[in-house]
Curated annotation (Swiss-Prot):
A GO term from the CC aspect: chromosome
Residues annotated as signal peptide: none
Protein name: Uncharacterized protein MJ0664
Pfam families in UniProt: Zn_ribbon_Top1 (PF01396)
Species for this entry: Methanocaldococcus jannaschii (strain ATCC 43067 / DSM 2661 / JAL-1 / JCM 10045 / NBRC 100440) (Methanococcus jannaschii)
GO biological process assignments: DNA topological change
Molecular function GO terms recorded: DNA binding; DNA topoisomerase activity
Amino acid sequence: MKNLVLRRDNMGEVLNELFEILSKDLHFNATKLNSETYEQNWKVPEGFISIIGIENAKMPVFYYGITNSYKKEFEIKKVISPKGQKQIFARIYYIFDRRDIIEKEKYVVANAFNGLLLLIKFDKTEFIEKAIEMLTKGYEEDNFIKEVLNNIKEKNMFDNIDETIRFVANRDYNWLIGRIKYNMGILEYSGQGYYLIPIKTNMQITPGIKINNGRVIIDLENSHLFKNFIVYVDTINNKIIYNKERLCNKNPAILDIMSKIDDNTCPWCGAKLRVVRTKKGEFLGCTNYPNCLYRRFPKKN
């Protein structure tokens, strides 16, 4: 069994939605580009944005090309730890064609833009639905995945394998998005929506972006990559966040969001935790169950 699934977004819809949101902010202008309109004999990025008049900006105006010509790969990653423990993780990768990126960079350089931004969209519902689909299929067809899921079911005291699969999908989503938000200093936001990541930082490929066999890969597991984001659009809270460290002269003070989180708060959904007692033992479970499957067990002495 191949634990890898490809999927493409509707790129026109992705760009339309992003530009519609950005156009509501006075600091952003956004325009679609195409080779026919601009009479170029090379490839042009799918879009162009300017960022104007932000406080303490390093430049009066920033100009960036935008490309969203990616395909997505979903994977159930199978791992054996140094101690011999079998593990599985749901993962997502955004794949760009390197030759396509190089051609679009020519347009960016020729027009003296500040850089080319890779646009990706991350959606919680899509990730969890795809992870559940792949884990369910894996449980039926892959002995490695089946063994790990059965172990997770017993360890976490779930009643059935469907609940276990939903737990793993949510666990992996929250792990990925939590690390990204921490590295970006945006723990108070949803993490869903649009990310604009520079292909290059200080004239080099941005740390965390993988180049492999003619592919430019954004792997969400490389969360340090997101420290270099230029713009993030939170589609759940309708917020636009730009990277002041990259665009402004004064570094912003990072809000101490972690101080607002205590041991009695669910890190997945923000609801309160409660003690759940079963025949197998007890644990702290989310009061939002069964919509949220988070649970924490007391540490063994």
